């Protein structure tokens, strides 16, 4: 009955947007702890042990309200703000619990939007690889792409203000301000170099940052959709000249703020495409470089005027797709012409026709990847494999499993590469590094160790897909060769794991 009463209280809070009472409910923190365990890839959970107490959390929240935040002295660093308790544990508990509560309005909006549009829930659309089929379909018809780095807000108040449109509970927002202020002071006194985006509180700040990006993209999408409804008029020729003289007299932001129809006309482009992953986005268009420069300077002024975030135009790079490649999601992508010769027969005359088509080319970044392998001591900066000395104390099966897992993840993620030769080189580095690590552990040479184990050791590095293809088709068949050369996009990749995570 108590569990039913708790969920009933949760439902009533959702209906009236009263999120503040949920902060003092223990099942919220238990739910946050369970989510932390299920999302161990993103978070390193510090534990919901027996020493944790909801009473201590209430005392901490009360103390945040009682403190005078206008008086901050250096002597505060010597004071124990948590009465002798583990402040890292309880700061993470409060942040994770608050993140679960604030996610409630976003979840309700998502469910209602799916029900209204009758959208089929497809988890395949969450895959990172689902972006590249979109590139293959749209980008060959475009000419220019802007590489945009979304700036981070300098002041935390900007992040709180972006939540006002979804979270309509003033008490919750006020408590969030106090917590951010308090936690920001802890981090500046304890770990000043790591800033506020610490690993232990990643969930809350990811939520705040995503709300900030969502606000930015909603305005950008509104301008994009509204500009498509504008029609050509006879005064369109005079628009550029009028805007030129107004820019001389007034700042650009005043023009955008006072003349909204002109702003929409300013960005009339039916071929604009926008893609984002985390803090990096691609803005591509079929139009001229002039329009891309308009978007570039508008984004800079938009961030400065609306979010009070300073951004330099140099953070936005405009490249021609046919001449330059852009780095996105670990791939070097570019548009290259694919010329095919077609023989045509017309009565007694025959002639050849060159059919030129543009194709998306996705390359494996061999040089950055060698740098990453050298950073974690799999090879040197020249790409020569070396032994992993820190793993030499592990068992043979554990060492082999670690190397096989890293090689399998790289093969799985970079299966969409147009040219697999660079990927095979990386796998060769991992194989030889594994052999050298095992030889170092057994105090033997590489040649002697390979003779003792035979080729079975290297067979461990074949991925599951390669083993299935080798069973279905003979290794000499042309079908298997096409599979090796062709691009394969997987719809089960939800995040990019860094090599350091395998330490």
UniProtKB/Swiss-Prot annotation:
Family matches, as InterPro entries: Domain_X, Maturase_MatK, Maturase_MatK_N
GO CC term (a single one): chloroplast
TM region(s), chain numbering: none
Compartment(s): Plastid, Chloroplast
Primary subcellular site in the record, as a coarse category: plastid
Keywords, ordered alphabetically: Chloroplast, mRNA processing, Plastid, RNA-binding, tRNA processing
Keyword Transcription regulation among UniProt keywords: no
Gene Ontology biological-process entries: mRNA processing; RNA splicing; tRNA processing
Source superkingdom: Eukaryota
Function (record text): Usually encoded in the trnK tRNA gene intron. Probably assists in splicing its own and other chloroplast group II introns.
Cited PANTHER family: MATURASE K (PTHR34811:SF1)
Family: Belongs to the intron maturase 2 family. MatK subfamily.
Protein name (record): Maturase K
